[in-house]
Design a protein with these regions (language model features):
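Nucleotide and nucleotide-moiety/phosphate-recognizing core
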Residues: 2-141, 151-164, 171-176, 191-226
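Short glycine-enriched, charge-decorated loop/helix-capping segments at active-site entrances
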Residues: 137-143, 181-185
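Hydrophobic alpha-helical segments within soluble ligand-binding/sensing domains
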Residues: 145-149
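Short, loop-centered acidic/histidine patches that primarily coordinate divalent metals
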Residues: 166-169, 185
């Protein structure tokens, strides 16, 4: 299976997004007795028209991790879609807020409150303008660099959460940024996109263990081997 075909399979396998507002925290009985150690959040906008935009690569990463590690099907909860699973023995809740990017933090806060987790238990996967396309870096805390999803998350939970920065590059002109981040990945970029998502999913156990340096190193090695 080629990387391009793998990416298509990933998107074809995603659970259908049910129209209407997803369930909020009080309706989170969908989670059953699951008690995650960590909450991993993919940032993006809900709906098919946004699915392949650069701004949605956080959603893509969450889907890739869930599919690669055999997470349970998505359930409506916390104003988003949540999937339960384990990575390297660590219980993880993968969350895709369905609140649209500008209000992502509300969904994250709801999940944190429900499971009584701290900001240090949260990892956010997001698109990063200030990183070359398909490069991956991890940092703890920091600013928002104008990213509305990060800004909303910070407003609701503070800024000391871990970020997995998924490089999309910069168009070179600040006036072109909005059109660029809301633009779809080109067909010619699909193999590189699939390679990045596959590497992030394959090395996710290092994130679960808190070894960010090893995660970044092994992802970089995988991507170098794919060049």
């Amino acid at each position: 299976l080629s990387l391009f075909s793998w990416l298509g399979t990933l998107f074809d396998s995603r659970p259908a997004e049910v129209p209407g507002q997803p369930a909020s925290a009080p309706e989170a009985e969908n989670m059953g007795e699951f008690a995650p150690v960590q909450i991993w959040v993919g940032l993006g906008n809900p709906g098919a028209s946004y699915a392949m935009q650069r701004h949605n690569v956080g959603f893509m990463a969450a889907d890739a991790i869930a599919e690669s590690h055999g997470f349970e099907p998505a359930k409506k909860a916390f104003s988003g879609w949540a999937r339960q699973g384990r990575i390297g023995g660590t219980r993880i809740l993968l969350l895709k807020p369905a609140t649209f990017m500008n209000d992502s933090g509300r969904s994250v806060r709801a999940a944190m409150d429900y499971f009584k987790k701290d900001v240090g238990d949260v990892t956010v996967f997001h698109d990063e303008l200030d990183l070359a396309p398909f490069k991956v870096k991890v940092k703890l805390g920091g600013g928002t660099a104008g990213h509305n999803g990060l800004r909303s998350t910070e407003a609701h939970i503070g800024n000391e959460f871990r970020r997995v920065r998924l490089g999309i590059g910069h168009p070179g002109d600040k006036d072109k940024v909005t059109k660029y981040v809301l633009g779809n990945y080109a067909k010619a970029e699909m193999d590189a996109l699939a390679a990045m998502l596959g590497a992030v999913a394959a090395e996710a156990a290092w994130l679960a263990q808190g070894d960010d340096a090893r995660f970044m190193s092994d992802v970089a090695l995988r991507l170098r081997d794919d060049e």
